[in-house]
């Protein structure tokens, strides 16, 4: 079943076209990876899906409903959350307060408390540091906090924008392991990532973007085996 369907999406910033007639879909239960170099349009696509950027053309369907003109907070309420590039945690708030910000649309206190327990179960470091300001966390821990904050809204679809960017190698594999665990627990994932090798290794399917256009698609294994992808993104 298709959870997200993007058809003929275009995004402009003034006279600059960042996304050109892009179409793809994400089926329920999948991890789908979008890979491409800087400037390929990946982040603009995610921002359009999450309601932060209004596309200039095209259609975005989430759970059968068009959302390209829906306000961002209503998209979150419908079951879609994004972890932005660069994490963007609230540095002056504690870990717990950051998590509570992720549940701002949910009024059921018991449900929120249960979700905090789930986040701490998945990210034990966050429980150890729950009363610390987010600014005191390492980059990897801040990424875990950003992911935990997004999961507080119990999304059906999680959008991840460059989750391994700027992280120490010890944290990178842990983040990708966590993404797989999130999928196993029933959350569908759309992943944008410059680390094409790791992104495709965990992906059910992938799309390759160049200068705002989809130029190649296939299963994660097919794209990893593609000579074109290896030369452009995998160093060989």
Question: Where are the regions a protein language model picked out?
Answer:
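The feature captures the beta-strand-to-loop junction immediately N-terminal to the Walker
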Residues: 35-37
């Amino acid at each position: 079943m298709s959870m997200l369907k993007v058809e003929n999406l275009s995004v402009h910033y003034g006279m600059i076209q960042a996304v050109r007639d892009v179409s793809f879909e994400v089926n329920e239960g999948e991890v789908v990876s979008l890979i491409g170099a800087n400037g390929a349009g990946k982040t603009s696509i995610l921002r359009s899906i999450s309601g932060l950027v209004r596309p200039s053309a095209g259609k975005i369907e989430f759970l059968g409903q068009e959302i390209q003109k829906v306000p961002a907070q209503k998209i979150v309420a419908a079951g879609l959350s994004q972890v932005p590039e660069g994490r963007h945690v609230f540095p002056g708030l504690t870990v717990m307060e950051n998590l509570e910000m992720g549940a701002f649309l949910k009024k059921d206190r018991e449900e929120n408390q249960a979700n905090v327990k789930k986040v701490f179960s998945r990210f034990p470091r966050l429980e150890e540091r729950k009363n610390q300001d987010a600014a005191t966390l390492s980059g990897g821990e801040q990424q875990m906090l950003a992911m935990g904050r997004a999961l507080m809204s119990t999304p059906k679809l999680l959008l991840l924008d460059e989750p391994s960017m700027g992280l120490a190698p010890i944290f990178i594999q842990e983040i990708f392991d966590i993404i797989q665990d999130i999928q196993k627990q029933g959350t569908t994932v759309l992943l944008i990532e410059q680390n094409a090798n790791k992104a495709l290794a965990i992906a059910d399917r992938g799309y390759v973007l160049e200068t705002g256009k989809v130029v190649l698609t296939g299963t994660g294994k097919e794209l990893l085996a593609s000579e074109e992808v290896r030369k452009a993104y995998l160093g060989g």
